[in-house]
Design a protein with these regions (language model features):
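Catalytic cores of the polymerase beta-like nucleotidyltransferase superfamily
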Residues: 1-476
Length: 476
């Protein structure tokens, strides 16, 4: 326990409370360890709503109900040093409440007055000192399988070892995650992938049986051998891709050099469900090869293939996100990333490209050009088998850099407006609007990028040539 622990300072914001109350949970645990306290959990023998109102008035904080069914209230803002959640004592009193908690290090209590000793009924102080995660009771995880994810997350966050009995209980309880509410599972998984070292946290989750319970398709990928261009099985490769995504996120200049700030800004942009684009890309990295087990084949030559794993994987990712009840925005981002993760690699041997050809790729992966390039690079870096040569990796990364340069250049030119809009082109060519018109507008955009269309006359001339090349009537 940290020598700097100050019980009175921790509980000072709770002075307006009138009924007996205690600080419990992760906030107390972190304070005892000398870690920053992001939130305080308070249990009270009084009326949580009335107590929340008293704190709100004293600190100018906002309050709102977390759960009317359980009588829990949350306070934020004002001059509160951190978020405060207030809820009633569960069961027959403090001891009963603490016995219902998950881990001994979370089953500690401190009187809200800041006076007296930390109440420890389950050896939590000892386990804090010994830096280990121990269950309060043998059925703690079975009663709520989502706690398996919490076990991995908190152990990783604190750098604690997981007690052997807790690990065994986690493996036994993990199958129950599939029957748990998707929203709760996704909330815990989001905390894992946004950890300081998400690859380490995910591997710890896997070690106690939780990863396959959350994403069964990844469990299917365990031990699935790949071609000689790979040095890892599919699951190992997937986790290494996640590592590379995080590494690029932290130091984009290592790959993208002068465009590091462009990458950093895009990955740091909020996307959905409390995740930034970069954090959502971590989830996409976990999903990108999830269909490889289902699509593995071996040719007569012995070559291992995974034909269509991008398309099938996109369908699997879509179904998974629906099970987890993610937002449509996050689901669409992940699905696009999985479906298109091979697109850049297919272009490596077709270089060099014109600006218009770069534009075709960028439009294909829109609105996620930066994230698509980061995932493509991470995927390439995690593919380093005996048949992979340094020049293959060099060419792939060079194309990614060139594509990022093109993205920056084209973005600076936007909006690229055609000299003639669709209605004007249809009228000039005396043709009814249809799919051909969208294709013509795309072709016109590419001609603009090449500098061959720049005004109405050049647009008219190009449109007539294009229609004629398609076997149509170019108009009068």
């Amino acid at each position: 326990v940290s020598r700097g622990f100050d019980a009175r300072a921790l509980t000072a914001p709770l002075a307006p409370l009138t009924a007996p109350a205690w600080v419990v949970g992760g906030g107390l645990r972190d304070a005892l360890l000398g870690r920053p306290v992001a939130d305080l959990d308070v249990i009270t023998q009084g009326d949580p709503e009335a107590e929340a109102r008293a704190i709100s008035r004293a600190h100018g904080a906002s309050r709102f109900p977390l759960s009317r069914a359980f009588g829990a209230w949350r306070l934020t803002g004002g001059d509160l040093p951190c978020q405060v959640d207030i809820m009633p004592v569960l069961g027959d009193g403090l001891d009963d409440d603490l016995s219902r908690r998950d881990f001994t290090v979370n089953a500690l209590a401190l009187p809200a007055t800041g006076e007296g000793q930390v109440i420890d009924r389950h050896g939590g102080l000892r386990d804090l000192d010994e830096r280990r995660m121990v269950l309060v009771g043998p059925s703690a995880l079975e009663a709520d399988p989502v706690r398996v994810l919490r076990l991995a997350r908190i152990a990783d966050q604190l750098g604690f070892a997981i007690d052997a009995d807790a690990a065994a209980a986690a493996r036994a309880a993990a199958p129950g995650v599939a029957e748990s509410p998707g929203e709760r599972v996704m909330e815990e998984l989001s905390r894992i992938i946004t950890a300081d070292e998400p690859g380490r946290a995910v591997r710890l989750l896997d070690a106690i049986g939780g990863l396959g319970a959350v994403i069964p398709e990844l469990d299917d990928c365990r031990g699935v051998d790949q071609s000689e261009y790979h040095h890892l099985d599919v699951l190992g490769h997937t986790l290494e891709v996640l590592d590379h995504v995080v590494a690029i996120e932290r130091d984009p200049g290592d790959v993208f050099r002068g465009n590091a700030e462009v990458v950093r800004n895009s990955l740091g942009e909020p996307l959905a469900d409390g995740l930034t684009r970069g954090q959502a890309l971590r989830l996409t990295a976990l999903m990108h090869d999830m269909a490889k087990a289902a699509t593995r084949g071996v040719m007569d030559t012995g070559r291992v293939t995974f034909i269509g794993h991008d398309r099938m994987g996109a369908d699997m990712a879509d179904a998974w996100c629906r099970r987890m009840r993610t937002s449509n925005h996050l689901r669409e981002f992940v699905v696009r990333g999985v479906r298109l993760h091979l697109a850049l690699g297919f272009m490596v041997h077709r270089q060099p490209f014109t600006l218009a050809q770069y534009d075709r790729y960028l439009r294909r992966v829109a609105p996620d050009p930066v994230e698509s390039l980061v995932l493509a690079v991470a995927d390439r870096l995690a593919t380093d088998g005996p048949r992979t040569t340094p020049i293959q990796i060099t060419r792939h990364l060079a194309l990614a850099r060139d594509m990022m340069d093109a993205h920056v250049r084209i973005s600076a030119m936007e909006p690229i407006r055609p000299p003639l809009d669709g209605a004007q082109l249809a009228e000039m060519l005396q043709r009814a609007p249809g799919p051909w018109l969208a294709e013509l507008l795309v072709a016109t955009r590419e001609e603009q990028l090449m500098g061959r269309v720049h005004d109405a006359p050049t647009a008219q001339a190009f449109a007539r040539r294009w229609v004629a090349s398609q076997g149509g009537d170019a108009g009068p």
